[in-house]
C-alpha cells in the first residue's frame, strides 16, 4: 500500500505513546510534505534531546544540566517536597504555578502485575535524600489508583524509620479514582494542592 520508506516511517511513529495507525499515517504524510530543512531541524532536535537530556541526579527530573534547574533554584522552598510518579506529573504540577518546593520523581508506580517493585523505582534514593536533607513536608501528587495508593503507603512505610516527624500529605479533592494526574487541569490541581490531606 505504501512505499517502503513511508511504511517504515508510519511504523516508527506508531511506537510513540498515544499514536495509533491513523494518526501515524497523518503525521507521516504531513512530514513528507514539509520542506527538507524542517525535517532536518526536527531530526536534529530529536538527536540533541536524546544525547543531552538526562535524569537529574537529585530528583530524577529530565534535564540537560545536573542538577536540574528546579534543584538549583534558590527561590525554591527546600523544606517542602512533592513526590510524583513521572516527569509528566512534575510538569502538570509546575503548570499550576502554586507549588514552590522541590520534587522527587519515583519513575513509576509499584505494580507487581507488571514486575515493578521498590527496586525498579527511585524509592531508596528518596529515603536517603530525606534522611540527608530533612524536609518538613512531603506532598504525594500521585494519581488516585490502586497502584498509586500502594506506592504512597510503601513509601510512607520506608520513610517512617528515617523521618518519624516528617509530615506526609496527599492531594485532596478534584481527582477522581483512576484518573491520571498529567491530564488534570491547572485549577483542579491547584485546589487539590491547597486542600491536601494527611496521608
Swiss-Prot record:
A zinc finger (C4-type) spans 56-71. CDD domains: TOPRIM_recR (cd01025). It holds the Pfam family RecR_ZnF. InterPro entries: DNA_Rcmb_RecR, Hlx-hairpin-Hlx_DNA-bd_motif, Rcmb_RecR, Rcmb_RecR_Znf, TOPRIM_dom, TOPRIM_RecR. One of its GO terms (biological process) is DNA repair. Residues 79-174 form the Toprim domain. Keywords: DNA damage, DNA recombination, DNA repair, Metal-binding, Zinc, Zinc-finger. One of its GO terms (molecular function) is DNA binding. Belongs to the RecR family. PANTHER family: RECOMBINATION PROTEIN RECR. HAMAP family: RecR. May play a role in DNA repair. It seems to be involved in an RecBC-independent recombinational process of DNA repair. It may act with RecF and RecO. This is Recombination protein RecR. It comes from Synechococcus sp. (strain JA-2-3B'a(2-13)). The gene is recR.
